[in-house]
Amino acid sequence: MDRSGYFNGIKLCGKVQVVNSFPDIKVQVVSSFPDLNVKIVSSFPDNIGEWQFVDSFPDFTIQYVDSFPDIKIKFVDSFPGIP
């Protein structure tokens, strides 16, 4: 992940779908030292770290993993983005 909030050309905001296989990004949820702070929003996920979970037509897909993640995230209520 780069400092501008992109991972392999994927802007880390928008509509996100959780999948069990072949994700765009493998994500590990952590409580400290995340790569990205994520705020779950119900609409307008326009800023880095704002994710709206959907069942179809995602901007990108994620898979939750316990090891070897592409990025580590922490769910927050405020101040989403790169810590």
PLM feature spans:
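Repetitive, compositionally biased segments used for assembly/scaffolding
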Residues: M1-P83
